[in-house]
């Protein structure tokens, strides 16, 4: 009898543990080094607490790699820009766009290196410009060249990931780059901003970042996607309620610096340069506006030879059902 009680207790504990693990889901989330308020929630473990999921956070340098990981099933939820998202959807990768993370403003820009001889857009002709291919930066670069009536064939566009851009910039191997932080911050140290994504948006070429999820994962774990979206939007609301007070909290800035690699002094400008849509905005945006933006992006990418065709309808790849007010 003395042995049975501990054994029964152990069996009960094992059953409880098994039940707990059965309820918890393993999910791999792909993130990038963009600066946004939700990175504080990421650093604080708020996503794990709200979703009750075992989350593995994986850092990626560009959206194209994230799409490849999602398509293979290695990643279930990912953060990427509108250009790689559009390219993926056009190729019918089974994903849903469930949250607009940011409408990109000053957080991405085209910078010309000091000493490159580039003072005006026309000076880009014959120069080397680095950008991660199929990224929002790539889309914006092509849109900027079109706006300035510069034939893309008259510049040398190099496909480099952000870490490689930083190295090439420091060596003086490239003349300009269209990129985001931390590479953007490095470029601005000895370079001139020619145009930002926010300015390009006014010329009819807006870009945005979004959170997407594999459709099969969303169907199996809708509660996780809903909780994930709520944590993100709560973080946005906390920032937008009083941006100055939020930035005055050094802990918030430190967490952004750690996860983004951006300089603390650049954080205010990067945050203020973007728009972080709240829940009410999401419900409206995750419909015709986003579908139209993706369609317009696909049309542009087809003109540039980056995708073979434009789908007749992108609505099945965009959903507001995971947004709770």
Which functions belong to the PLM regions below?
Residues 83, 164-257:
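Pocket-lining segment of extracytoplasmic ligand-binding domains
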Residues 299, 303-325:
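Hinge/cleft segment of the Venus flytrap/periplasmic-binding protein
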Residues 18-24:
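Sec/Tat signal peptide C-region and signal peptidase I cleavage site
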Residues 1-11:
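Bacterial N-terminal signal peptides that target proteins for export
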Residues 48-52, 199-203, 277-289:
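Short, solvent-exposed loop/beta-turn-alpha elements that line the ligand-binding surface or hinge
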Residues 51, 74, 79, 89, ...:
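Sec/Tat-exported extracytoplasmic proteins
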Residues 25-151, 156-159, 175-181, 197, ...:
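Short, glycine-/small- and polar/acidic-enriched structural segments
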Residues 219-306:
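Secondary-structure end/capping motifs
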């Amino acid at each position: 009898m003395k042995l049975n009680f501990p054994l029964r207790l152990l069996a009960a504990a094992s059953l409880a543990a098994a039940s707990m693990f059965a309820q918890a889901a393993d999910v791999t989330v792909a993130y990038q080094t963009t600066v946004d308020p939700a990175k504080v929630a990421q650093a604080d473990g708020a996503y794990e607490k709200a979703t009750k999921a075992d989350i593995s956070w994986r850092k990626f340098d560009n959206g194209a790699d994230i799409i490849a990981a999602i398509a293979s099933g290695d990643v279930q939820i990912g953060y990427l820009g509108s250009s790689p998202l559009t390219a993926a959807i056009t190729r019918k990768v089974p994903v849903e766009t469930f949250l607009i993370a940011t409408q990109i403003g000053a957080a991405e820009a085209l910078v010309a290196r000091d000493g490159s001889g580039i003072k005006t857009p026309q000076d880009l002709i014959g120069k080397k410009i680095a950008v991660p291919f199929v990224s929002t930066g790539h889309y914006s670069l092509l849109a900027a060249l079109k706006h300035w009536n510069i034939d893309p064939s008259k510049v040398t566009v190099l496909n480099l990931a952000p870490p490689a851009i930083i190295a090439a910039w420091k060596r003086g191997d490239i003349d300009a780059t269209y990129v985001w932080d931390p590479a953007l911050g490095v470029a601005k140290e000895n370079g001139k901003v020619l145009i930002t994504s926010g300015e390009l948006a006014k010329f009819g070429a807006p870009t945005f970042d979004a959170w997407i999820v594999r459709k099969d994962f969303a169907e199996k774990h809708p509660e996780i996607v809903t909780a994930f979206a709520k944590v993100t939007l709560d973080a946005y609301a906390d920032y937008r309620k009083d941006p100055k007070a939020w930035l005055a909290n050094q802990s918030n800035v430190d967490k952004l610096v750690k996860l983004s690699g951006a300089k603390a002094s650049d954080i205010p400008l990067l945050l203020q340069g973007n728009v972080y849509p709240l829940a009410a905005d999401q419900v409206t945006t995750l419909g015709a506006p986003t579908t139209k933006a993706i369609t317009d992006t696909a049309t542009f990418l087809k003109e540039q030879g980056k995708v073979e065709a434009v789908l007749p309808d992108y609505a099945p790849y965009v959903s507001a059902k995971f947004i709770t007010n």
